[in-house]
Amino acid sequence: MKNSRSAAVRILPYFLLAVALMALSYPVVHAPVTHADDQAVPTIGSMAPDFTLDSQEGKPISLHDFKGKWVVLYFYPKDQTPGCTIEAHAFQRDQAQYEAKNAVVVGVSVDTVESHKEWCAKDGMSFKMLSDADKKVVAMYGSTMTIPQAPQLGTLAARNTFIIDPNGKIVKEFIKVNPQGHSEEVLAWLADNAK
């Protein structure tokens, strides 16, 4: 009895971690997206707020670097979690289609540069993954969230995507994205609208 109780105590932290990771993989529809009262949330037709963040290579990347291209700016909660991996793999798989549409995919989360570097190397992602560790850009884009079941994770990026036209204007928003099939959804929108 004593051994089974101590074994249960030893595995409890792993169980709690597994629950937190499962919560991250669950579509964000079930997690509250929080917006501070003073938080600027861009709208369709407005100029996309510019920013500079470090990429997985540790190099600063600015939104204005992509002027003249369509930008698929997608926010996601956490590197190497199931839902985020599904979404990132699909964006990577479809890179040639994005390039053919003069579009670039840019991922943003609150993970560190080192975390992005490790994940991109492990899973072969070549598009830009930007680190917003201080959470300023996710707030600028109204894309912050918390997971009540995993408060230890703090504020994360909500799974939202913004399509920015070659002039820097927000032309489409996908809010509370389901990672399954999202790249196809974005490509379909670009096929109909990116002329």
Predicted feature residues:
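N-terminal secretory signal peptides that target proteins for export/translocation
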Residues: 1-9
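Structural microenvironment flanking redox-active thiols in thiol-disulfide oxidoreductases
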Residues: 83-137
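Short loop/turn microsegments at loop-to-beta-strand junctions
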Residues: 48-49, 70, 158-160
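Thiol-/selenol-based redox modules, centered on thioredoxin-like
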Residues: 153-195
